[in-house]
Every structure is written in structure tokens, then in C-alpha cells.
């Protein structure tokens, strides 16, 4: 979980995972970002290599349009989260926005093997899938899980034993993942 008052000094890096990564296997370099009021969880497949990052947070590649799309949807300005001068994204705007909206981020893979030197899902081999049920237990207010690609969707469906992958834009129900307390 994150504390909104300390976000500017918070590191989102998962230093233990970074330290145990090898040339062969990469462990997830970021901690799950799960605001206390998380209602929507975005799940990608895995971050790009750190050499492609412009910030230590989700969707860190400056050529990726995720933060531009969020800016356009929520603020009518594709550059709302963009620092053009420094070619990075504005974490000082992103974090409070996500906390206010209750939007969380993580990925469907906890460890991967890159089959080529790039960020393409096509060349990611799952070594350790994320325990999505355990992740959702941490955010009981979550009502929507959004996957951001085919590989993330496949892994999520495998986790919940859903045999038919949804088409793009289609919503499906996943089993109740919250423990009865």
C-alpha cells in the first residue's frame, strides 16, 4: 500500500527483486502500486528493461503512450503528465492522481526470461506468474481488473481457469477472489 503523504520520498523500486535478478531471469523491479482505495487494477505483463526507463514507476518508457492517454481522458490534455523538456513523466502529478482515483498497477509476471533484447510480450517467457488472487486480497474495494495486452490477459485467464479469452474491449467476470471473513 502507499501513503499519499509520503509519495514523494517513496521508492517504488523493489530492490530485493532487482538484486536477485540475473542475466537469465528478471524479477519484477517495481513494487505493486495499490492505493488504499484501489478500485481499478491495471495489470500489464512486465516492465521494459531499465535502460528504457525515464522514471521509476509503471509505464516508464517515454515512447509508451499510457500516461498521455490517461492525461487526455482525465484532463483533456495528452501532455498533462509529460515533462517534455526532460523527456520524462511527472510522477508528482501521476501519484496523487492515481491515489485520488483509486487506480493501482502491477503485472501478471513476477519473474520472466527475455528471449530477445526488447520489451515485446512475444519474447517474454513466464518464469513465475503473479499470484493475482493474493494481490486482490490486498485491495478488497477493487471491482475492475484491466489487462493491458494479450499476454497479460492470457496469464490472468490461466490464473482463474477461464478457458475463453475475451476479445478486446470485452468484460468478463472473474470468480470471487475475496475470502469470506
Predicted region positions:
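Domain-level recognition of soluble alpha/beta enzyme cores
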Residues: 166-178
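A polyanion-binding, active-site-adjacent surface
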Residues: 11-144, 150-167, 181
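Intrinsically disordered, charged low-complexity linkers and terminal tails
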Residues: 1-13
